[in-house]
């Protein structure tokens, strides 16, 4: 039952038309520790949806849940995370997950935060499991995995258990809420670099501002022609955060040095089917659209952490790593690895 103190905080927030960041943190903090009844959680989420999400709402909720979460033992400098909001209905192969493996093979330190499928046939965890990448590692083993391979996967529920308090309400409401964009913002690695795909381009500037507030040095927020990915089928809108400044621009497949493909060419299946498609790309026998989509997103990763000076150069670098066998060799070395507590040579 919601106590009087929490109810007072909620009531005051609902009466404010333009809350401050501090007020948003204050109203979401009781939610992180289960102090609101479901009906009061629903009131909060529907109020924000009706009023319209503000920077304070999103940043305040993110800060409250990060404060309640469990950070990864290694945080910050040099780390990257990448994920999308989902919800675009495209059901493509796991482009971002495949690209993150290419980036790791090329030296990017990837702390990928994700979950199993929610809005698609295959979530990042589903395809990684099918590829043989170890999941469900405790923090110490995950650190060893990162040190050995430049990649680790962090299951969202293990690091942000407080989100469970809102899940029954989200499911019951059946409508999009602020929490549809929250997942990628709660990265346990508190990374220096982050790429986030968004299904709704109207949120681009806002999300970039939230990344600035959360301390990201560089970030890319992308929306690709109706999808939460860099598009090979049309124009991608990009909001780039770099050293405190946010810029907005557009990219076409031609800008990236890749061919134009149809969105249908990226249609995916379940985790096993998508893993097969990724393996084919890494082996040099994949569908051209799959190859180009993965290279495009990996190219953005190489640009973001400074490996290359432009996304176009990053795409070329990713293409070379795939074609010369570096990525396939990386996967063969690190799939099914144990990362146990015993000393390794």
UniProtKB/Swiss-Prot annotation:
Q: Which reaction does it catalyse?
A: N-(5-phospho-beta-D-ribosyl)anthranilate + diphosphate = 5-phospho-alpha-D-ribose 1-diphosphate + anthranilate
Q: E.C. number, please?
A: 2.4.2.18
Q: In which pathway does it act?
A: Amino-acid biosynthesis; L-tryptophan biosynthesis; L-tryptophan from chorismate: step 2/5
| Keyword Glycosyltransferase in annotation | yes
Q: Where does Mg(2+) 2 bind?
A: 228-229
Where on the tree of life does the source sit, at the highest rank? Bacteria
Q: Which Gene Ontology MF annotations are present? A: anthranilate phosphoribosyltransferase activity; magnesium ion binding
Q: Name one GO biological process term.
A: L-tryptophan biosynthetic process
Leader sequence residues:
none
**Positions contributing to Mg(2+) 1 binding:** 96, 229
Where 5-phospho-alpha-D-ribose 1-diphosphate binds, per the record, is at 84, 87-88, 92, 94-97, 112-120, 124
User: InterPro entries attached here?
Assistant: Anthranilate_Pribosyl_Tfrase (IPR005940), Glycosyl_Trfase_fam3 (IPR000312), Glycosyl_Trfase_fam3_N_dom (IPR017459), Glycosyl_Trfase_fam3_N_dom_sf (IPR036320), Nuc_phospho_transferase (IPR035902)
List positions binding anthranilate 2.
Answer: 170
Q: List the disulfide bonds.
A: none
* UniProt entry keywords in alphabetical sequence: Amino-acid biosynthesis, Aromatic amino acid biosynthesis, Glycosyltransferase, Magnesium, Metal-binding, Transferase, Tryptophan biosynthesis
Recite the UniProt cofactor note for this protein.
Answer: Binds 2 magnesium ions per monomer.
Listed binding positions for anthranilate 1 are 84, 115
Cofactors that this protein relies on: Mg(2+)
Provide one Gene Ontology cellular component.
Answer: cytosol
Entry's family note:
Belongs to the anthranilate phosphoribosyltransferase family.
Question: Briefly, what is this protein's role?
Answer: Catalyzes the transfer of the phosphoribosyl group of 5-phosphorylribose-1-pyrophosphate (PRPP) to anthranilate to yield N-(5'-phosphoribosyl)-anthranilate (PRA).
Assembly, in brief, is: Homodimer.
Read off the HAMAP family from this record: TrpD (MF_00211)
Q: Under what name is this protein listed?
A: Anthranilate phosphoribosyltransferase
Q: Which organism is it from?
A: Corynebacterium aurimucosum (strain ATCC 700975 / DSM 44827 / CIP 107346 / CN-1)
């Amino acid at each position: 039952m919601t106590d009087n103190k929490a109810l007072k905080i909620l009531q005051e927030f609902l009466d404010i038309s333009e809350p401050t960041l501090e007020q948003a943190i204050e109203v979401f903090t009781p939610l992180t520790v289960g102090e609101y009844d479901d009906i009061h959680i629903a009131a909060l989420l529907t109020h924000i949806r009706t009023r319209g999400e503000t920077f304070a709402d999103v940043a305040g909720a993110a800060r409250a849940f990060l404060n309640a979460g469990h950070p990864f033992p290694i945080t910050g400098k040099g780390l990257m995370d990448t994920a999308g909001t989902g919800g675009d209905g495209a059901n493509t192969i796991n482009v971002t997950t495949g690209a993150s493996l290419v980036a790791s093979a090329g030296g990017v330190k990837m702390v990928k935060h994700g979950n199993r499928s929610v809005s698609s046939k295959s979530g990042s965890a589903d395809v990684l499991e099918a590829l043989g990448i170890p999941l469900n590692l405790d923090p110490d083993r995950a650190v060893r995995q990162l040190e050995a391979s430049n990649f680790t996967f962090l299951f969202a529920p293990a690091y942000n258990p407080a989100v469970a308090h809102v899940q029954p309400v989200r499911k019951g409401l059946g409508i999009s809420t602020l929490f549809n964009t929250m997942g990628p913002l709660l990265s346990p690695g508190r990374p220096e670099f982050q790429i986030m795909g968004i299904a709704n381009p109207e949120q681009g500037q806002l999300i970039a501002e939230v990344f600035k507030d959360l301390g990201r040095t560089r970030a890319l927020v992308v929306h690709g022609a109706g999808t939460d990915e860099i598009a090979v089928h049309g124009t991608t809108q990009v909001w780039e955060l770099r050293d405190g400044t946010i810029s907005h621009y557009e990219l076409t497949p031609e800008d990236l040095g890749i061919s134009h493909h149809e969105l249908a060419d990226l249609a995916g299946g379940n985790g096993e089917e998508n893993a097969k498609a990724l393996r084919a790309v890494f082996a040099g026998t994949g569908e051209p659209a799959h190859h180009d989509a993965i290279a495009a997103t990996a190219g953005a990763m190489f640009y973001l952490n400074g490996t290359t000076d432009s996304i176009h150069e990053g795409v070329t670098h990713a293409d070379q790593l795939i074609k010369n066998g570096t990525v396939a060799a990386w996967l063969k070395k690190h799939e099914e690895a144990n990362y146990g507590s015993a000393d390794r040579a």
